[in-house]
Amino acid sequence: MLKGKTVLLGVTGSIAAYKIAGLASMLKKQHADIAVLMTQNATNFINPITFETLTGNKCLIDTFDRNFQYSVEHVALAKRADIVLIAPASANVIGKIANGIADDMLTTTVMACRCPILISPAMNTNMFLNPIVQDLSLIHI
């Protein structure tokens, strides 16, 4: 079903991050090419090695990887992506995207993408009810 499709899976700092390992596994079983981009805070909840093992691809965290291979990684990923799924999406990352802040690998890549972007919020109810989080239509997501 997803053979030949590239899914960028953004994982942010939320307790729900551990659940995304199962999602990555299901996407892989559907033959998707999965690139996992984690925020630094996400690594406090789940180890990048988990995603590397499940997807067979390097998990990207740092925007400026010292193993530079003659491509600007976030731009190359954005061009390859058929869809971006940010799950779990913390209030922090939603706020950054809504305001055009691109200060890590995930948000920088999202800013360069021209494909559909799906955001799956995961946060405290009061945080979720904040107008910035609620009005994702402002950023056409």
Give a label for each model feature.
Residues 99-113:
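A short, gly/pro- and small-residue-rich
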Residues 139-141:
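Conserved small/polar residues in nucleotide/adenosyl-binding loops
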Residues 37-49:
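Glycosyltransferase specificity loop/lid
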Residues 91-102, 127-130:
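Glycine/threonine-rich flexible loop motifs
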Residues 87-90, 116-125:
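Short beta-strands and strand-loop turn motifs
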Residues 1-40, 117-121, 134:
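N-terminal phosphate-binding or glycine-rich loops at protein starts, especially the Walker A/P-loop
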Residues 46-47, 121-133:
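Glycine-rich, charge-decorated loop segments at or immediately adjacent to ligand/cofactor-binding or catalytic sites
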Residues 52-96:
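Glycine-rich oxoanion-binding loops at beta->alpha junctions
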